Amino acid sequence: MAENGKNCDQRRVAMNKEHHNGNFTDPSSVNEKKRREREERQNIVLWRQPLITLQYFSLEILVILKEWTSKLWHRQSIVVSFLLLLAVLIATYYVEGVHQQYVQRIEKQFLLYAYWIGLGILSSVGLGTGLHTFLLYLGPHIASVTLAAYECNSVNFPEPPYPDQIICPDEEGTEGTISLWSIISKVRIEACMWGIGTAIGELPPYFMARAARLSGAEPDDEEYQEFEEMLEHAESAQDFASRAKLAVQKLVQKVGFFGILACASIPNPLFDLAGITCGHFLVPFWTFFGATLIGKAIIKMHIQKIFVIITFSKHIVEQMVAFIGAVPGIGPSLQKPFQEYLEAQRQKLHHKSEMGTPQGENWLSWMFEKLVVVMVCYFILSIINSMAQSYAKRIQQRLNSEEKTK
């Protein structure tokens, strides 16, 4: 692996020398031009240039569709096999018979797994910004299960409506029968699938860096370019962010599997750098993905689950509400909506929602719903901006290639 990396470095250095010698290009002017182009792309956002952003976004979609159509056309055998398999599955799904009970069971599990894996992928990939699906979906789900478990003294919620809606079973348990482990077991599938999704979402930086290293070509990805610049100026790094990135890079490079496992197991915003580092230094795929999967889907998820469950356990919640009420002056007015919300949730769990305050009238529920809407809208806007900037980068690359051929 070290020899491969050394050969790739030598090949890239040779290509850079040839490029500079052949075209008499000053490296400083090249870097300045790249900086200007990056600033131009960053200005292409909906709130600054809405018409151009929407135009470039639409054109980028057309380019991507054209590329995928071409790829599928050159893989006709795979496409035909997939369509035949899809036809068999559709026929099995709609044809009546004794197999329908198994089909419905498989469909339910498949949709559940796909939902949480998809949210995990969205949380990692983000296309420019992460949709924090743990804070918006998985965390609230674990909190709801925790509150319901302590209220019902059971985790055997009726299915259906669980997991879409949580209500207490007809035969509730006795006080004190709920343990931390029982709640962890109840939400294990959702949390594990979400963790698998986040691990899958970390693959693009790895594959991008690996392909750039093996080809010896100049990478197009800005994060990878920043990574190479960081390696070049490693000794002169002074600020905390640069030192933290270098620490992650050295940990992954020197420790290998267990270094990747450590980075994946601890919630941190620098794990993308671990994927780029592994790809750049040609770490084997299963070493990277195996460590990432174990770290994110098992270790990290259990840390996050335990934190949420403890935070929303019955006595902690009661203490937090009491603490809010003790705030001088505004305490009682702040405490009231929390008490109303918790009371409404208890009544819903016991099929008595019509007797309590409707959830829609509670400002806590209203604020959380609006927060979800705002974050999802921001995520969609970031995708539009990111794709528009990708098309702008295509234009810049085409113009640069035309200048070189003149």
From Swiss-Prot:
Keywords: Acetylation, Autophagy, Cell adhesion, Cell membrane, Endoplasmic reticulum, Lipid transport, Membrane, Transmembrane, Transmembrane helix, Transport, Vacuole. The chain crosses the membrane at residues 44-64, 78-98, 110-130, 251-271, 274-294, 306-326, 364-384. The modification N-acetylalanine is found at A2. Residues 65-77, 131-250, 295-305, 385-406 are extracellular. One of its GO terms (molecular function) is phospholipid scramblase activity. It is found in: Endoplasmic reticulum-Golgi intermediate compartment membrane; Cell membrane; Vacuole membrane; Endoplasmic reticulum membrane. Residues 1-35 are annotated as: Disordered. Phospholipid scramblase involved in lipid homeostasis and membrane dynamics processes. Has phospholipid scramblase activity toward cholesterol and phosphatidylserine, as well as phosphatidylethanolamine and phosphatidylcholine. Required for autophagosome formation: participates in early stages of autophagosome biogenesis at the endoplasmic reticulum (ER) membrane by reequilibrating the leaflets of the ER as lipids are extracted by ATG2 (ATG2A or ATG2B) to mediate autophagosome assembly. Regulates ATP2A2 activity to control ER-isolation membrane contacts for autophagosome formation. (Microbial infection) Host factor required for infection by all flaviviruses tested such as Zika virus and Yellow fever virus. Probably required post-entry of the virus to facilitate the ER membrane remodeling necessary to form replication organelles. Interacts with BECN1. Interacts with TJP1. Interacts with TP53INP2. Interacts with TMEM41B. Interacts with ATP2A2, PLN and SLN; competes with PLN and SLN to prevent them from forming an inhibitory complex with ATP2A2. Interacts with ATG2A. The VTT domain was previously called the SNARE-assoc domain. As there is no evidence that this domain associates with SNARE proteins, it was renamed as VMP1, TMEM41, and TVP38 (VTT) domain. This is Vacuole membrane protein 1. The gene is VMP1.
